[in-house]
Amino acid sequence: MRIEVAVILALLVISPALSSAGGEEGQNTPVGCQLSFDGELANESVQFQTSLGPRLPGSAASSALRESIKSNLTGWEITEKTHHVNGMVLTNLFATWNPGLGSTVILAAHYDTRGQAENDWNESRRDEPILGANDGASGVAVLLELAKHIPAMNLSHEITLFFTDGEDQGESFDTYALGAEAWADNLSAEEIDSIESFVLVDMVGDSNLTLRKTSPGDTELWNRTIDTILFFEETCGFGDSSYFNFDGMDYIYDDHVHADRLGIPSIDIIDIRYGEGAEFFGGHWHTHNDTADKISADSLQKVGYILESGLLTGDWLDARLPEVSEESKPEPLDNNPPDEEEDTEQDSDDMAVGVLLMGCILLVWGNLAWLLFADKRGEG
C-alpha cells in the first residue's frame, strides 16, 4: 500500500513541474513570429477593387471604394477630408484605432489609380485610365487585411490608416502625391510632433517582389525593417529573405516625402520594378497590364507581415533620434549591456527551475526507496 501511495505522490509532484517546463517552452515563441495576416484575403480585396474599374479622384468608383473601406472598418473612427487641387476634388480617408491614446503611428497607401497609361505598348490606349491592381489596390488591400488584426493587439498608442487620394495623377514630381501634400500642409506643429512614424506601402503585390531601401527614408526605420526581414528568415522560418535587395536603394517621390519634409520618420515600402525582369519604373507600371492576375498573395503576405510585426514589437515607435549635447550625454554604461543582463537573469531563472525540479524528483524518489527498503525489512 505504501508503495502505491509513493508512486501516486511521485506523479503528483513531478507532473506539474514537467508541465510547467513544457509550458514555458511553448511560450517562448517570439512575439514577432506570432502573426495573423492572411495574404489570400488581401488578394481578394485586390480583385474586388479592380472590379470597380479605375478609381480616379471624384469618380463613382472612387466613392464606391471609400464606402467599401469604411464598411470594412467597423469600430474605427473614420474621417474624410476633401481638398480642391489642380481642378480635382481629392478625398483623403483616415481610419483611427485608439483615438487620442498616446502618440500616433500612420500606415498609408494611395487608393486612387492613374488616369492614363502612358507606358502602354498600345499607343491608342495611352489616354485611358488603368485598373491599378498593383499601383493602387495592393497597398489598400494590405492595410485592410491588417486592420482586422489590430484591435486584438491591445496597443497602447493610436494607429491611423491613411488612404491617400491624388497620388498618381501627376505629370512631374511636384504634381504627384497631391492628397498627402494637402494633408501635410494642414498639420499643426503639435500634430507633427505626435506622429511617431509614417510607413507607406505602394506597389507591393508583384509576383516577382523585390524590395529595397528607398530615399528619402528614415535610416532607423529602414534598419528595423531589414532586421525584421532577417528575423523572419532566421528565427520564424517564414522563408528566405531573397525578396529584399540589401545592397540597393531607389530614389522615390511618393506620398511619404511630405511626411519626411516635416521631420516625421518615414519610409516607402515599394517595388517599382513591376514584372519579371522589369527595369526601374518599367514593366507593367502605368500600363493596362496592371491587372489582378499579376498580383501574388504571397507577396502581399510578406509585406503584411512586416507591418504587423512592426506594430507588435514596437518597431514603428521611438524612431526619432533626439539631439544630445555634449553636456547632457549620459555616463558610459558599465560592462554589462542590457541584453547581457537580461540573458543572465533568464539563465538564473532557468537554473533555479531546474534545481527545484531536480530537488523534487530526488526527494520523492528518496522517500520511495526508503519505503521499499522498509517493506523488505517489515518495519512499516
Residue ranges and their predicted role:
Residues E128-R224:
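Acidic/histidine-rich catalytic neighborhood of metal-dependent amide-processing enzymes
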Residues S197, D206-E345:
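Active-site-adjacent substrate-binding region
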Residues E44-G100, F238-S242:
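A non-catalytic alpha/beta surface segment that caps or lines the substrate-entry region
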Residues R55-P57, H84-G87, P99-L101, Y111-G115, ...:
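Solvent-exposed loop/turn segments at secondary-structure junctions
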Residues E40-S45, T50-P54, W76, T91-T164:
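Catalytic-core environment of secreted peptidases
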Residues E24-R66, E279-K294:
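N-terminal capping segment at the start of a domain
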